Each structure stands twice: as structure tokens, then as C-alpha cells.
Amino acid sequence: MADRTVFDSPSRQSTSSPSNNNPASINHRSSFAENLRHSPRAQRHPSFTQAAVQELLNHPPVPKIGDPRFAGRDWRQIHVGELVQETDIHWCELDTDVERATKALIESGPPNVILIRETPDDVTACDSFDYNDLNAYLLVVLGLANPDEEQKETYSQLASKAREHVPIPLRDVITLAKKEPLTTLSESEDLSKAVEIFGSGVHRILVCKPGTTTVVGILSQLKLVKFLWDNGSSFPAIDQLYPTILRDLNIGAQQAIAINGDKPLTEALQLMSNEGLTSIAVVDNAANVVGNISTADTKLLTHTSSLPLLQSSCIHFISVILSERGIGDGKDSFPVFHVNPYSTLAHTVAKLVATRSHRMWVVESASPSPSAPATPSLGYASVVQQPSGGGSVPPSPSFPAVSAAALPGARISGRLTGVITLSDILNLFARTTGLNPMDPNESRARRRRSSSASVRPSMDSSRGDYLDTIREMNQNNLKNIFQYRGLSMRTNNSSELEVEYKKTREIMTRPGAKFQTLLQDLLPDGGKQGMRELKWVNQDFSPPK
């Protein structure tokens, strides 16, 4: 069952399987670095040096010169019909088989959705088919879905038909995934209405002819954010927000769902389906973001030859994603799916637009400097203590943990502390300009509550496993603190240990000047990170036995 860990992430990883000709290699799981040497990416020269990539991260591209059609106009009075094209619409019918619909979805590209109608002559959409639907369907076929009791027979029949290569119509598939109802707007409506809807957590709007249900275009959150970014100079009310750092804007969520990079890919697919997410962060054992997997990546799993990938780790699958992206684009792929609380809104939006992402993982920065965002004073406890906690189970010996520090470019990432989405940004734009969108966090909460009760036991157990890992890390930190104080945890006197434990907790909670000086002498960063760690350790720790 998929582990549900509350966190965040960006990307990077490895492919290549052990050779079957060497018996000794069968039991050896290659490290990321070993696999990377044999990947297609290793045969190409990177498009950027790491220094160039870091410069790009610190100073993302500025907005393009605005479209003269919108210069001087109030963006709230621009019609939604001015932003859409009929060429973005791709149709299938309810009786279209899943295989053909999947091919159409992959070939059509953005906005990554197929509209469904009852007959070829209809111009009214009755439903949609996107990568979330494809992911849910794959899980049913693989027997990894979690149906309610009354759904089990239906799911079993779908899986049997798929194995027997019997065509399955979309009408049997489109109810599998958790999805929003179709939202429509007249093409004559102003953008203010679209921003308010998107800022409430809706991801896609069907634009129709006035007074009809005839679809003339599809407006997505990403398309609207890109429009406002490219034409920012024409919209001062929004443009003035871009230089502000995320911490001061107070947007986003201080919890994000992530998965350990050594977990099987199938668990990531389950997690996205159960939580109604389009992507999740991939993290290492220290919660450093090392990758990003989205439902759109399921297009790499639609061929029979790709089935072995389902048994691979998330780390391995990310390397496949990067290789495929590099081959398709003709250059090395260096995704950057993270920001930190000291990143500006402009920096964040530029990344979202450049990577065509729906969310950026918020991480702690490595160190403050004029050219790089400073380290926020956020402890790891803010992640662990979220109410919808998760489970990152320590990997087994056959699935060795991959350290983010060992991955190419991993040092530009950091520990996951939250997430910022297109919904959050559009909600900010709406509120700033006097609109009244719903809180996007309410949409997230509804999505979480809608998760099937059948998956909850595994969620609870995985959280327990995760807290065990945290306590182990805390114990190691506490041991160091005892050593700083000249104490030893190896004592036969439990009452003495209890007393010293309480004293140490007191130091961790309210460190005195003397202990601060000791930390400043011992720790490379002058004790600042150490003080945060000490407060964090105190959040979730039981006295050592």
C-alpha cells in the first residue's frame, strides 16, 4: 500500500537494470550514480554547466514584453474567449476505447485533456479524460486500486477485460478517478471570473459560446498564469506583487505529500490516485527533495515493454523521465521544481511557467547569501506535525537509500517544508484585486476527505513507521547533545538518565547563553541550524529506554 508522507520535492535519478549474465549482479541494486553513467544522458554534453543552472535558478527569466493587444487594459475586463483557441479541443466519444483515447491524450499535448461527448456530432462535453483518469485505470488493471465493497466486481471485470485485450469504452473508465465536475464559462465573461474560480482550486474551465454549451476552448490555470506573467507590465496591480518573497505573501501550504525515492513506483501512482493529486515530491531519508513524479508521466507506462518500470523505484523512474525528456528535447534535462520561502513570487512564477508545472515544492535553503535565497527559520517539525501525517518507511537492504547529496545538482535543493500551487497564486491575485475566491486549502481538504476509507489503515500504519524513523533520528541528535554536555546515555541508573534527559529537554527548549556559545563553537554555521534542530528534536521524542 502506498505510504503517505507529508512533505515536498524537485527531480533527478537513474535507470538501467542489472545484467542477467552476471549472477553476482542479480542481487546487487545499482546506485543512482552507477546507473547514470550508462544512461543515454551520459552520452550527451549537458546544455548548461551546473554554475549556469544555478545562475538560472537565482535569476530566472524576466517576463516577456506584453502583447500590445492588452496594453493599458484592465486585466479583469479582458474576456476569457480572448485567451483560448478551438485547436486546443480534442474529442472522443463515450464508446471510444481507452487505448485510442490514451493515444489521443498523449499526442494532443497541452492542455492535457480529452473532452468526451456522447456522439461525434455533439459539441457539448459530458465528461473529460486526462492523466489522472489514465493513472486510475492503470491501477485497476494492475489490481492496485482500492475499491469499495460494491465496486470490487466492476474493478475485477475491468482488469479481466484488459488482460484479455477486450476493448474497454471510456464510459466504463471515467468514473474511476477522483475529479472535479466540469466547470464552464461563457467566452464573453471577464478574466476576473476565471481568476476567482481558479483561485478557489478549480484546475480547468471549458469556455463556451454565450448562452450555449458549445465548447470553443479550454482555459487552464497554467495558461492564465502564463498570460498574466507574460503581460505583467500591462497589469500593475499584479505586477507589483512579483518582487515580494513568498514568506511575506503567506501563501501556499505548510504540508505536502511526498514519497521516499526508494519506494516502488506503484506506491507513488497509488498515492496520487488516492489523494487526487497530479504530482508528488520524491524525497530522500532526510526529506530532501530529489525528484518529482506527475500523473502525466504515466504516458511512459502505456506500452507493454514499459511494464518492468512498475516494479522499479521512484528514483529509477525519475531517471527514465529525464532520459526520455532529454532524448525528446535533444538536450540534457535539468528540472527545477523547488523554491524556498525567500524566493520572490516572480522567481516562483517563472519556474512554474518554464517547467509547465502546477506546483513548486518549498524547501529550506542551504545558506543565506545576496545571490541565493536565505535559509528560512522553519523547523522540520512543521512538516512532521501536520494533521494528515505520512509514512516514509526505512528502506530494506535490497532498496538502499539514495542520499540527495550524492545526486547531481542535489545541493541546490533542500529539505521539504511545503508546497505552492497555481491555485495559491491565482487566489492571491484574486484577493489582491478585490475578488472573493474560496480558500484553495478547503478544496485540498475535501479531496483528502474523499479518499477511500479502505486506504486509511495503511495510511495510519505508515505514519507510525515514519514516526519511528523520526524518533531514531531524534535519538541520535539527543545523543550528540548529551555529548556536548559531557554526559553519557550509557548508564544503568534509569532515574539518573531521566533527570539528565529532562535537563537536556530544558536546554533544547530554552537554550541559555552558555549552551549557545558551545554550539557556536562546535557547529559550522555558528549554531543557527543547530538551535533549530534542537527545538525540532523536542517536538516528537520519548525518553530513551
Curated annotation (Swiss-Prot):
Biased composition (Low complexity): 9-25, 451-461
GO terms for biological process, alphabetical: cellular response to glucose starvation; regulation of mitotic metaphase/anaphase transition
Ranges for domain CBS: 83-154, 177-234, 252-309, 366-438
Keyword Metal-binding part of the UniProt annotation: no
UniProt-listed PANTHER family: AMP-ACTIVATED PROTEIN KINASE, GAMMA REGULATORY SUBUNIT, CBS DOMAIN-CONTAINING PROTEIN
Protein family per UniProt: Belongs to the SDS23 family.
The protein's name in its UniProt record: Protein sds23
Organism: Sclerotinia sclerotiorum (strain ATCC 18683 / 1980 / Ss-1)
